[in-house]
């Protein structure tokens, strides 16, 4: 099961014995690993909702603005946050520190760009009533700005998939599936925030939850928040996930648990399962959450969550549960998904229809859409289905012995797929460019888990591609007579080509 290292809050409060005319300073130290926190934002709001006697929204704004400029001291209030004649000065100082610790946590969770704010801080209370905090920063503004530009580009890739006519469900599943399919769980437990998770490609549950929140709440204006569960074993790591508002009702969504892992049969290491996405923990109720996995190490009976997720609509209406970890595709106002051995299409408020029959044998566990073509995999082949006419045909056939194509996805005009040997849990990843959709991929070879060359052929011409670290490069366009092409490019060390080019009679040229 996916875990993060234990998170423990240790607080030490120190008070000076200042006289009444001098400033009174209280220090509240925060442990290096902060505790999880639960809160929500309502739809179309980009600030968390809290209930308090003081203006927390105003304090959040001041801390955010001050931290963005990396000020050494930030005034959060001109008057005391705690006024109670029954409390001693030390007790007031401690309570003030606890309040601000909670608020700073909320700032860090709500805004991933605050990742550079370290966990230790100092609270200062002055005789005038003014309250300030001194924050510590892990890196300078210039480096933060560079990282944020990269993070903004990552988010833009997700947001480019969102259209104004999408339903709440379609937006949520698009964000969920993109995060799961493009990122992986950090089994070294080093990355906790969304920014560094996006830049490095991996993170723990805190990073998954923060990124889902940032896109859904901050960018799309959807109601979203965090829920927390403690480990059933005292002292072991807890877990954090999201709650999301869909059409006025709240549901649990756990992208971390929906990102499959497997144990590598050779290294015995816990490894990301590429191109796979589960929806087992997507849009479920409180009751479903409690019953979904009785052996879960997380106590789902006693969670910390600011809202009730009592609506069971998606508990009972989730045909994609049978999709074997295939992506749910949103395209032209409809969703496409695998249910059993059928590819289904469902438009909003309409019944789902099957666009591929049970006997078509085109379905394994992956689908993708590029223009008017839907791609699906079965055994050693990838097939295409023309959505406008229902025509279908073979697009690609693996040349890697008995390896089976299991999963696929399309991103940026490139179709990526996984290959695995029978009775093995190891995966290789290949890719095919989709710039020319009228031809069929005739042959390819995987080297070190990456496809390094392929041939696309139509009745009149053929094109040879090679992949290097920069991406796909079109090397030649030729008419039939492929022995010449084969001889010319197999010795090209720059691309490490190892081709199987197929021609008449489907005979490999290198065997003739």
Task: Put a short name on every predicted segment.
Residues 207-287:
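Hydrophobic/aromatic-rich core segments of domains that either
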Residues 402-433:
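Blade-level signature of beta-propeller repeat domains, shared across WD40, Kelch, NHL, RCC1
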Residues 140-197:
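Secondary-structure boundary elements
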Residues 340-341, 456-462:
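Short proline/glycine-enriched turn/loop motifs at strand-loop junctions of beta-rich domains
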Residues 21-156, 346-358, 384, 393-397:
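Linear, non-domain "peripheral" regions
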Residues 337-338, 375-377, 416-419:
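Residue position within the beta-strands of beta-propeller blades
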Residues 320-330, 360-371, 401-412:
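Repeated scaffold domains used in trafficking and secretory/extracellular systems
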